[in-house]
Amino acid sequence: MFTGSIVALVTPMDEKGNVSRSCLKKLIDYHVANGTSAIVSVGTTGESATLSHDEHGDVVMMTLELADGRIPVIAGTGANATAEAISLTQRFNDSGVVGCLTVTPYYNRPTQEGLFQHFKAIAEHTDLPQILYNVPSRTGCDMLPETVGRLAEIKNIIAIKEATGNLTRVHQIKELVSDDFILLSGDDASALDFMQLGGHGVISVTANVAARDMADMCKLAAEGQFTEARVINQRLMPLHNKLFVEPNPIPVKWACKALGLVATDTLRLPMTPITDNGRDIVKAALQHAGLL
């Protein structure tokens, strides 16, 4: 459940900005039908930053209810205050989620020792499996391989989502962790190379609109069929890149709407709808991928 193509799911909203239960069900059904390994609910792509704490919990619980055991659900529970991250994580202790994705603290930029103590404290307050999340382009904070190695010794810290796009990190981390520690790419454009170097899968934005392709690509990679996997990846490469032509999740929400997976591409401020130019770029990438 922690390998293959794991989708960083968008949070669908109606025109007033309320979470749409019907569209959420449609998205979950789409991923169940198309081979997605698991769903990350209310991560960065799921607009965790603009949901209240109550809404955050409600969306995860709604996702669990609608998934109904058909696909594993991972809760995004990161925060830049350790006590807040612990509280968010503990909310899901007995909920049915299979694990939590916890991003490095953002904006306050802790030291490596601060990062270690932060994730150690979260792990000590839950039995849920923890997936570390390193995305310095968003957080301003880069968790180094040596810190990951220390954290990997903690029993319920079982994986990392490594979103630097720096492929040397795969080897660096693998040298410092046990063989059962899971390495997940957080960068669609380099995910296949990441897996070829020994990674186990990807937490994917692209999978929101290309679930079957991403699942097939990851399956082929896991089987060592990289030539075949690369055919899929080359077709998706413009999409991997253009889904970030504007800040995530602006482009992917519009793409979901364009494919009829959600009713609107509504976001909450300060996120604003995609520009006309951005829409044209994403549309061309969807067409190149054979999705539109």
Swiss-Prot record:
Reactions performed catalytically: L-aspartate 4-semialdehyde + pyruvate = (2S,4S)-4-hydroxy-2,3,4,5-tetrahydrodipicolinate + H2O + H(+)
Location of the active site: Y133, K161
CDD domains assigned: DHDPS
Superkingdom assignment: Bacteria
Main location: cytoplasm
Protein name as it appears in the record: 4-hydroxy-tetrahydrodipicolinate synthase
Function: Catalyzes the condensation of (S)-aspartate-beta-semialdehyde [(S)-ASA] and pyruvate to 4-hydroxy-tetrahydrodipicolinate (HTPA).
GO biological process: diaminopimelate biosynthetic process; lysine biosynthetic process via diaminopimelate
Gene source species: Salmonella arizonae (strain ATCC BAA-731 / CDC346-86 / RSK2980)
GO cellular component, one term: cytosol
Cellular localization per UniProt: Cytoplasm
Positions annotated to bind pyruvate: T45, I203
Keyword terms: Amino-acid biosynthesis, Cytoplasm, Diaminopimelate biosynthesis, Lyase, Lysine biosynthesis, Schiff base
Its EC number(s): 4.3.3.7
Family classification: Belongs to the DapA family.
Sites annotated Part of a proton relay during catalysis: T44, Y107
Pathway: Amino-acid biosynthesis; L-lysine biosynthesis via DAP pathway; (S)-tetrahydrodipicolinate from L-aspartate: step 3/4
Subunit (UniProt): Homotetramer; dimer of dimers.
GO molecular function, a single term: 4-hydroxy-tetrahydrodipicolinate synthase activity
